[in-house]
Amino acid sequence: ESPEILLAGGGQQSAWEAFASYIPVGFDHILPKGLDHILFVLGLFFLSTHLRPLIWQVTAFTAAHTVTLALGALGWVTVPGSIVEPLIAASIVYVAVENIFLAGLSPWRPLVIFGFGLLHGLGFASVLGEFGLPQDQFIPALIGFNIGVEIGQLTVIAVMFLCVWQALRVMRGQGDPRAAKGLYVALTVIALALCIVPMPAVAALLEAPVPVFLIPLALVFTGCFLSVQFRQVAAPYRRFVAIPASVAIAVIGAYWFVERVFL
C-alpha cells in the first residue's frame, strides 16, 4: 500500500516530502490500476516501429494531459466523469483503429492525440481529486503526481519494447531468427504456465487476476514468433504483432465505451 499522506495540518510535510510521496500515487494510477490509460499508450506504441512517431505522440499526449490535470486539480475545469470516461474509451478505439489502416504518423495524429490527452488529464484530475492534495504543499504534490504518471507511461512503453525487441531486430536483419524464435516460444510457455500458478500476493498487488496481464503478453510473444517465422512476407511485425494487438485494443475500448454509456 502507498504510505499515508497528510492532507492537512499546516506544515506537516515539506515541499520535497509532498513531491516525493505523490510520485508513487501517480505511478500507481497507471500501473497497475490504469488499464484504460495503459491501452491508450500501447495504441500509441503500436502505430510504428520507428522512434520518431512515438516521441511525437507521447510528447503531444503528455503536454495535453499535464494542462488539464493542473486545471482540474485547481478546480478551474470540471467535467463529469459520465462524460470523460466514455470519451477516454472512445479515444482508445480511435488510436487502435487508425493503427490498423495507417502504417505511419499522419499529419493530424499528433493534434488528435493532444485532444485525447486533454480528456485523459481530466481523468487523472478526477482520481487525484478523490485522493486529495495537501493544502499547504499543493503544487509540489501535483508535480509529483504528474511525474509518477509519466514514469508509469514510460514503463509501459519500455516493457512492451523489450517484449518485441528481438522481433524488430530480426526484421531489420540484425538478429538471429532461430534464437529469437526460441526466446519467444520460451516466453510464451512461461507466461501461460504462470497463469495457472496461484499467486495471491501478485494478484493483490496488481488488483486484478494475474492472467489479465500475462495472457496479453503471451499473445504478443506469439505474434512476435510468427513475425520471425514468416519474416519473408511484407511487413511481418505489422501483420502479426501491431495489427492484431490494435484490433484487440479497439475491441476492449469499444466494450468499455458501451459499458460506460449504456450499462
What does each of the following model-derived ranges do?
Residues 1-35, 127:
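Histidine-/acidic- and/or cysteine-rich, low-complexity loops and terminal segments associated
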Residues 29-262:
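Hydrophobic alpha-helical transmembrane segments in multi-pass membrane proteins
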